Regions:
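Catalytic P-loop NTP-binding/switch module of NTPases
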Residues: 217-223
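N-terminal glycine-rich dinucleotide-binding loop that anchors FAD/FMN and/or NAD(P) in oxidoreductases
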Residues: 1-14, 144-146
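FAD-site-proximal beta/loop scaffold in flavoenzymes
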Residues: 23, 27, 34-114, 206, ...
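General small-molecule cofactor/ligand-binding pocket signal
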Residues: 9-11, 80, 157-159
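A short, polar/charged loop-to-alpha-helix boundary motif
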Residues: 198-217
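Mid-to-C-terminal Rossmann-like scaffold of FAD/NAD(P)H-dependent oxidoreductases
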Residues: 85-198, 229-233, 237-269
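Short, surface-exposed charged micro-motifs
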Residues: 18, 71, 179-181
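A conserved short coil-to-beta-strand element within the FAD-binding core of flavoproteins
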Residues: 12-24
């Protein structure tokens, strides 16, 4: 609804099959239908530009990213690599992957420089903290998402919370939707995704810190975060996520996910 309110038309699950240049612009053929446009922006992800490394005989993975060790060293003697060109280790799952982000790239550069200068330093891995802004809306993520947790067969669960970015009685309060991925066995926070407005970035950073520190939902309930009505609530959205997960882990409450509703018994027992 937010995107539509801004005049954005979403054509989902509808791929581009052909692009034709015309006298008035572009004619774009889709799987279902077609559109005419002055400009086409293809935002289809990135891939490592490692042709030089390949020519030099440096080991690459199947996606073409340079393989490095924890010291950022490649397979070639005295050659180091960092940034968008390299394969990384996921700090949560310890799986190899490709996450090209500026923050990790800068930290990798410092670690490579340390090792080149004889200072033993290791890179602890990437957890994929990222954020973007769509008009005034903020979409932020850190750690693993449910798709990854499911693919790896992790013993996980998820909790959805909808909390105000600051005290409801203070003007301008809006809700943020938070999805938290956690380990069902011990409550350890594995990932979080947030969609909201002002204040969503701060909460994602708190989740990022919590994940890096190996914190659990129980720890989230105890966090003492800055509070004044213009900035937050006495029970911060982070605390609320912790409370909800704690209630689930201690079986104070049960939750039924939206995708399970169709499988519920039809005898009014629930």
């Amino acid at each position: 609804h937010y995107m539509k309110s801004k005049g954005i038309h979403l054509s989902l699950e509808n791929g581009v099959t052909a692009i034709e240049e015309t006298n008035t612009g572009l004619h774009i053929t889709l799987t279902k239908g077609a559109v005419n446009a002055d400009m086409l922006i293809m935002a289809i992800g990135v891939r490592p530009d490692t042709a030089l490394a390949k020519q030099a005989g440096i080991a690459l993975n199947e996606r073409g990213a340079i393989i490095v060790d924890a010291h950022m060293k490649t397979s070639a003697k005295d050659v180091y690599a960092v940034g968008d060109a390299i394969e990384i280790t996921d700090s949560i799952t310890e799986q190899k992957g490709y996450i090209p982000l500026a923050g990790p790239a800068n930290k990798q550069g410092r670690i490579a420089a340390d090792n080149i200068c004889g200072i033993a330093s290791t890179y602890p891995g990437t957890q994929g903290s990222s954020i973007l802004k769509i008009f005034d809306m903020i979409v932020a993520s850190t750690g693993i998402n449910e798709k990854t947790a499911k693919r790896l067969g992790l013993c996980y669960d998820k909790a959805y919370t909808f909390s105000g970015n600051h005290a409801d009685y203070y003007p301008g309060a809006v809700k943020m939707a938070i999805k938290t991925i956690f380990d069902k066995t011990n409550g350890k926070i594995l990932g979080a995704q947030i969609v909201g407005f002002e204040g969503s970035d701060k909460r994602c950073d708190v989740f990022s810190t919590a994940i890096r520190a190996g914190m659990t939902a129980y720890d989230l309930t105890k966090l003492e975060l800055c509070y004044a009505p213009p900035f937050g609530s006495a029970k911060d959205p982070i605390n609320m996520a912790g409370f909800v997960i704690e209630n689930l882990l201690t079986q104070k409450v049960k939750q039924i996910h939206w995708h399970d509703v169709q499988n519920l018994p039809k005898d009014d027992s629930i």
